[in-house]
Amino acid sequence: MAGINQKNIRNFCIIAHIDHGKSTLADRIIEKTGLLTSREMQEQILDNMDLERERGITIKAQTVRTVYKASDGQEYIFNLIDTPGHVDFNYEVSRALAACDGAILVVDAAQGIEAQTLANVYLALDHDLDVFPVINKIDLPSAEPERVIEEIEDIIGIEAQDAPLISAKNGINIEEVLEQIVTKIPAPSGDASAPLSALIFDSLYDAYKGVIIFVRIKEGTVKKGTKIRMMATGAVEEVVEVGYFGAGRFIPCDELTAGMVGYITASIKNVRDTRVGDTVTDNDRPCEQPLPGYKKVNPMVYCGLYPADGAKYQDLRDALEKLQLNDAALQFEPETSIALGFGFRCGFLGLLHLEIIQERLEREYNLDLVTTAPGVIYKVHKTNGDVIDLTNPSNMPDPSEIDYMEEPMVSAEIMVTTEFVGPIMKLCQERRGIYNGMEYIEQTRALLKYDLPLNEIIYDFFDALKSRSRGYASFDYEMKGYERSKLVKLDILINKEEVDALSFIVFAGNAEERGRKMCEKLKEEIPRQQFEIPIQAAIGSKVIARETVKALRKDVLAKCYGGDISRKKKLLEKQKEGKKRMRQIGNVEIPQKAFMSVLKLDDE
């Protein structure tokens, strides 16, 4: 470890659109530099969460350090960070970029540039990184590397004539990529003797070691025994161990110096002491000012998370705090619901993010959860001039106090092949989209620009986009701001009682249809009882849709055989009377499936 020359360090990450082969290229780099033997290799070695392997996507940015002997005879240390491609995990990418000096842009030779490719490249250029392109999947019969090279130069404007043409899957031309990392990515700068300043770009919780923080050392040196201070929270700790990242494991070392990427443990037990984006400095000899951290990420989608068993409330709080360490974009605050008890209002970056967090809570922390329908943040302008941010429909003021409401809008860019332009434009119109123009990138592909309400895209816009374009469209969006809109709160009443967890805010023009669909869906999910259950959708006091779950009834006439009609009538009347009394005092259990099915309203 000692005596590493800073000139021989390369910190870089791999960026690309979903499924263009980032993680596979990372595998090949690890294999070619001899970090793991071919027996130890497995596909997507850096995707170490079960969830990532099952879905075949990268969720967490993962770091690994490997050594490469270049053609100039010198040994170089590579710190490689594999990043996610999904729009929901953009903040993971920006965190990884802050720890790097350069980036490899992977582009699929058959599909070319897609919306997410552009978004990630611009992120990298914002961080002043040197980006060099690599054309992957050249072994595919449909590969057109020449066309893709032209596209990269025309659309992104970076030199691509000498881009390596590789197949990460078959290991073709990987050597060329390794050589270009050495020549095209700059060595880190920074003075090892200056006061310590290090950027926390990730962290995780270990039951034995406490909080483990991942850092990029910008200036100075840190070793065991150093007293460190977190500049944002002011927490002071003594370093127990420093080290770097092997494949799937931590490797301790003596010290980390300027330019290196590694981890620090300091027996930090309080999860709130470390924040991603904070600067670590030496307590006795601090640096003058903190490093520019990250833009704070604002959640786009909110929903309630409740433990199915109310006694597990504290466990859910602990689990959320530990997940927040590892996932800086997750936000939560306590809330209560009449129907579901105590829980948390959580903020996410998108629906995929919500799903992943929910699955991680259920798997890693053995929790059983109930989720309410996701919604966005609305701005409510009241008649007295106050403006409130509304994340929970239950907190909506009385309609008489509301002057008007605004909803968040996004600017979306949709990249699509020309044959599907029609269906995609129709989809955007159905979702209240405002057309902003279209550019043809080449004869066969177009870039559509739309302003869309965030409310309309958080549910299943992505799925609808993929199905209407047979998987060819790609989509990227960014927040545009708030616009005035006619919104109403839709309440769901079950057995004449309002269920606050099922309420949601909807555009007035779609309210009736949504209400009707919701009632039909709930009718399928709620089990029949001894009495009939009315399910109603209402705006204020006006009921706009109704379905009824029929009662189960005993055949009271079974003993009557022939018998007199008035005797039968008497028995039926008596039964009817009993059912009526039951309905007044009966409680309806709403199964978890009913809450979930409401999220999938538009799938039919």
Swiss-Prot record:
EC number: 3.6.5.n1
Transmembrane regions listed in the UniProt entry: none
UniProt xrefs under InterPro entries: EF-4 (IPR006297), EFG_III/V (IPR035647), EFG_V-like (IPR000640), EFTu-like_2 (IPR004161), G_TR_CS (IPR031157), LepA_C_sf (IPR038363), LepA_CTD (IPR013842), LepA_IV (IPR035654)
tr-type G domain residues: 7-189
Protein's gene: lepA
UniProt keywords, alphabetically: Cell membrane, GTP-binding, Hydrolase, Membrane, Nucleotide-binding, Protein biosynthesis
Species of provenance: Lachnospira eligens (strain ATCC 27750 / DSM 3376 / VPI C15-48 / C15-B4) (Eubacterium eligens)
GO process terms (BP): positive regulation of translation
SMART domains on file: EFG_C (SM00838)
Membrane topology: Peripheral membrane protein
Protein residues bound to GTP: D19, H20, G21, K22, S23, T24, N136, K137, I138, D139
Enzymatic reactions: GTP + H2O = GDP + phosphate + H(+)
Similarity comment: Belongs to the TRAFAC class translation factor GTPase superfamily. Classic translation factor GTPase family. LepA subfamily.
Pfam families, A to Z: EFG_C, GTP_EFTU, GTP_EFTU_D2, LepA_C
Protein name: Elongation factor 4
Gene3D superfamilies: 3.30.70.240, Elongation factor 4, C-terminal domain (3.30.70.2570), Elongation Factor G (Translational Gtpase), domain 3 (3.30.70.870), P-loop containing nucleotide triphosphate hydrolases (3.40.50.300), Translation factors (2.40.30.10)
GO cellular component annotations of the record: plasma membrane
Coarse class of the protein's main subcellular location: membrane
Function comment: Required for accurate and efficient protein synthesis under certain stress conditions. May act as a fidelity factor of the translation reaction, by catalyzing a one-codon backward translocation of tRNAs on improperly translocated ribosomes. Back-translocation proceeds from a post-translocation (POST) complex to a pre-translocation (PRE) complex, thus giving elongation factor G a second chance to translocate the tRNAs correctly. Binds to ribosomes in a GTP-dependent manner.
